[in-house]
């Protein structure tokens, strides 16, 4: 009796472990697929975020690499191709292999317009997906966060932010 209970518990633990590993692999796969969507469409990026650097992909596309989880990633607006995919199709649900509606929230980005000579943080409608927020496209949640992460220390001083 004890052995059968032990085996049943072990089977449940094994099933949960396998599900967790598959979900992790699946989430990484979804993030990689969405990342590939960005690279394939090669959107223009200013890469103004703190601690970010321009990197060149194999196809020649220049993208902005920022620390994982940093709101600096979102100093550029989300590329339209990714924004549209998440707004229209929703957030990938890796555990059910489906899509859930994206929550529409306000996020901030740095808009630099060389024609009108303006440079400021502006809000936009952002498709929030909890599973993608940290790993793929985290964006500043407030104007203050945008100013902190999207302007250098010198720019912040000139603007009177600090």
From Swiss-Prot:
It comes from Caenorhabditis elegans. Its main location: secreted. Residues 1-23 form the signal peptide. Disruption phenotype: Mutants display an increased body growth rate during larval development and male tail morphological defects characterized by thickening of the male rays, with rays 5 and 6 the most severely affected in most cases. RNAi-mediated knockdown results in increased body length. Coiled coil: none annotated. Pfam families: BPTI_nem. Keywords: Secreted, Signal. One of its GO terms (cellular component) is extracellular space. GO terms for biological process: negative regulation of multicellular organism growth; nematode male tail tip morphogenesis. This is Protein lon-8. It is found in: Secreted. Secreted protein that is involved in larval elongation, early adult growth and male tail development.
């Amino acid at each position: 009796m004890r052995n059968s209970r032990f085996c049943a518990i072990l089977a449940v633990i094994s099933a949960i472990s396998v599900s967790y590993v598959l979900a992790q692999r699946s989430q990484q796969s979804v993030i990689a697929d969405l990342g590939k969507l960005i690279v394939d469409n090669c959107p223009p990026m200013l890469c103004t975020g703190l601690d970010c650097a321009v990197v060149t992909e194999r196809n020649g596309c220049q993208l902005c690499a920022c620390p994982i989880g940093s709101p600096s990633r979102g100093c550029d607006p989300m590329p339209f191709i990714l924004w549209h995919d998440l707004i229209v199709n929703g957030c990938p649900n890796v555990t059910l292999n489906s899509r859930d509606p994206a929550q529409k929230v306000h996020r901030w980005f740095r808009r630099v317009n060389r024609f009108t000579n303006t440079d400021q943080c502006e809000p936009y409608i952002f498709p929030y997906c909890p599973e993608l927020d940290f790993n793929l496209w985290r964006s500043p949640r407030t104007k203050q966060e945008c100013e902190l992460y999207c302007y250098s220390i010198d720019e912040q001083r000139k603007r009177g932010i600090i």
